[in-house]
From Swiss-Prot:
PROSITE patterns (alphabetical): PRPP_SYNTHASE
SUPFAM superfamilies, per the entry: PRTase-like (SSF53271)
One cellular component term from this protein's GO annotations in UniProt: cytosol
Keyword Kinase: yes
Catalyzed reaction equations: D-ribose 5-phosphate + ATP = 5-phospho-alpha-D-ribose 1-diphosphate + AMP + H(+)
Source taxon at top rank: Eukaryota
Function of the molecule: Catalyzes the synthesis of phosphoribosylpyrophosphate (PRPP) that is essential for nucleotide synthesis.
Residues given in the record as Mg(2+) binding sites: D135, H137, D146, D150
GO BP terms, alphabetized: 5-phosphoribose 1-diphosphate biosynthetic process; nucleotide biosynthetic process; pentose-phosphate shunt; ribonucleoside monophosphate biosynthetic process
Record-given protein name: Ribose-phosphate pyrophosphokinase 2
Single annotated GO MF: ribose phosphate diphosphokinase activity
Species assigned in the record: Gallus gallus (Chicken)
Gene: PRPS2
Activity control mechanisms: Activated by magnesium and inorganic phosphate. Competitively or non-competitively inhibited by ADP, 2,3-bisphosphoglyceride or GDP.
């Protein structure tokens, strides 16, 4: 069996180091830089001939630069005769652009790009043999690839966090901030043996504000909002206010991917949250300095175990329902 080599891109070195430590590995030598014209340069600093290569690069920060860096790293390892190249992408870039969506007038549908499919094509053409990611925004993105894709889930780690950190978890209710997340929250609610609710955004006519309609009873319960990602946090912060006004005793938000761009931090600080809990698929250190409500769940053990099992030819489905030690 070939040896395993683990490389880190520039997007999230802390997570890469955590994964390497759990695997008992040193991160491979790689130098990334930019030329004066802003082209990305990558130099792999060690032999990868015949090796099983894993490159960790999350879709965050300077997303376009980091995506290009990942593509170049994949290609550099592939043409250096590695036996297999796996791209480990904790937060998949462009995942929200997964279909032709209505963005105004109906006639604009035909001109909307499906950028997630384009990213899938680029990764394959660059030379990736396998993709490991987490909580894809749309699970059908797996079908955009002609190579194996392992979509891991943060759910087991989320369940563990709830049981360890919310004393009243048996009296909680799991809430989806929109109808699209109903399947996610029902799965968590079933495993906790609690009820679920959802918030439906009722679209108004032009020049009228959308109205949020709560479906479910949260009175005198701890409400836990669950979603796969939050960007500017307008939806979840309005949802938190709605839950408090409906009688929830406390409100938490648990998200896999905390993007937190634009006014997100100020909105969270001013919202009625006890805590906003995210995984570390995206770096959160700087944001936590400005927002004490943000906490994170470390998912490096899930990624590390997925890499170990993939390298050894073992099934990764165990990770869909268990948190590795």
């Amino acid at each position: 069996m070939p040896n395993i080599v683990l490389f880190s891109g520039s997007s999230h070195h802390d997570l890469s180091q955590r994964v390497a430590d759990r695997l008992g590995l040193e991160l491979g030598k790689v130098v990334t830089k930019k030329f004066s014209n802003q082209e990305t340069s990558v130099e792999i600093g060690e032999s990868v001939r015949g090796e099983d290569v894993y490159i960790i690069q999350s879709g965050c920060g300077e997303i376009n630069d980091n995506l290009m860096e990942l593509l170049i790293m994949i290609n550099a390892c592939k043409i250096a005769s590695s036996s297999r190249v796996t791209a480990v992408i904790p937060c998949f870039p462009y995942a929200r652009q997964d279909k032709k969506d209505k963005k105004g007038a109906v006639e604009r549908w035909s001109r909307a790009p499906i950028s997630a499919k384009l990213v899938a094509n680029m990764l394959s053409v660059a030379g990736a043999d396998h993709i490991i990611t987490m909580d894809l925004h749309a699970s059908q993105i797996q079908g955009f690839f002609d190579i194996p894709v392992d979509n891991l889930y943060a759910e087991p780690a989320v369940l563990q966090w709830i049981k360890e950190n919310i004393l009243e978890w048996k009296n909680c209710i799991i809430v989806s901030p929109d109808a699209g997340g109903a399947k996610r929250v029902t799965s968590i609610a079933d495993r906790l043996n609690v009820e679920f609710a959802l918030i439906h955004k009722e679209r108004k006519k032009a020049n009228e504000v959308d109205r949020m309609v709560l479906v479910g009873d949260v009175k005198d319960r701890v409400a836990i909002l669950v979603d796969d990602m939050a960007d500017t946090c307008g939806t979840i912060c309005h949802a938190a206010d709605k839950l408090v006004s409906a009688g929830a005793t406390k409100v938490y938000a648990i998200l896999t991917h905390g993007i937190f761009s634009g006014p997100a931090i100020s909105r969270i600080n001013n919202a009625a949250f006890e805590a906003v809990v995210v995984t570390n698929t995206i770096p959160q250190e700087e944001k936590m300095k400005h927002c004490p409500k943000i906490q994170f769940i470390d998912i490096s053990m899930i990624l590390a175990e997925a890499i170990r099992r993939t390298h050894n030819g073992e099934s990764v489905s165990y990770l869909f329902s268990h948190v590795p030690l």
